Amino acid sequence: MIYQANNQKQRVLADFDQALVWSVVLLLSIGLIMIYSASIAIAEAQFGADRASYYLLRHSAYLAVGLLLGLVTFQVPMRIWQKYVTYLFMISVLLLALVLVPGIGHEVNGSQRWISLYVVNIQPSEFVKLFMVMYAADYVSRKAADLNSFLKGFLPITVVLSIVGFLLLLEPDFGAFFVVTALVMSILFMGGVSLKIFIALIGILAIGLYELILSSEYRMARVVAFMDPWADPYGKGYQLSHALIAFGRGEWFGVGLGGSVEKLFYLPEAHTDFLLSVLAEELGFVGVAAVILLFIWLIMRTFVIGRLAAKLGNTFSALVAQGIGIWIGVQALINMGVNMGVLPTKGLTLPLLSFGGSSITANCIALAVILRIDWENRQRLRGLNV
């Protein structure tokens, strides 16, 4: 009986990419530990010493919801996702528009990115990223023969991207706009779009991004602060200068878990956008390197899964897996770049680690989709229909 139970357990584990699963488990675990460490001071100040675990418990609840939805998501075949993705995408865009409606949208730190449900705030842009990946993957898989045509293949998806981008910029959420644009462009490139059209659009987008920065006072202020945070360390460069101080204090091995000084009201958003800075201070270069390697490994696995799906003839699944990998990779890269002073502040969370209900829920659903693709790949290799 014990032998049979062990064999059954091995068969279950063989149905999943264990390297992907463990990289996700480790990142989620590190996130929980660091959120608790980074948020103790602010939780005590806001809610009292007896509620120091407030943000940890809240994030744990978000994670539990995300894992539950991920479990449900895993049961849905990819053919069903492809069949209904257009409707899901339209709903997510509608929610993105509702954010801008007075009385429905909820403003935080000068940006109207949330819909308040009293108990929680939902950030539709996080789910738009997921469904934009699926919509673009479905579009490219259906329109593969027309991708070299500007009017038939390229223009329709560009119009859709423009509508989503316009709504994101109205919030404003420049970081999400950049990520969504990068996702669509990457999926088009992987789908085999004409190189001439692709390069032309990259040029147009680069000019557009440059103009968007120049036309916005607050974006220009962020760029100026990024160029030299020490020129105004108590004003525009305050957040970045303290993030860099946190990295400097961490050195090789950090000051020890829980020993961060910057999280004590010096570094704003320590448990959200700038969690990596607290991690760098407490765990040092070694801790940051470990997190980066886990992200690299996770992204590599998504591409391996996507490549196998392509070999098995499922273009939609292949593009979804690789698109989600690019989403996580681009957003992680931007967040890390901001924390290290390599990129201007964008307001993006670190996937799987930072505090945030919508972010962690969308991440869990996205990773469940990848696990579903991997599971379907393995079933097809065994000659089974899915």
UniProtKB/Swiss-Prot annotation:
Major subcellular site: membrane
Record localization: Cell inner membrane
Short name of one Pfam family: FTSW_RODA_SPOVE
Highest taxon in the source lineage: Bacteria
GO cellular component terms attached to this protein's record: cell division site; plasma membrane
EC number annotated for this UniProt entry: 2.4.99.28
Keyword Cell cycle annotated: yes
Recorded metabolic or biological pathway in which this protein acts: Cell wall biogenesis; peptidoglycan biosynthesis
Single GO MF annotation: lipid-linked peptidoglycan transporter activity
Family: Belongs to the SEDS family. FtsW subfamily.
Function: Peptidoglycan polymerase that is essential for cell division.
Database matches in HAMAP family: PGT_FtsW_proteobact
Protein name (database record): Probable peptidoglycan glycosyltransferase FtsW
Originating organism: Nitrosomonas sp. (strain Is79A3)
Taxonomic lineage from the root: Bacteria, Pseudomonadati, Pseudomonadota, Betaproteobacteria, Nitrosomonadales
Gene that specifies this protein: ftsW
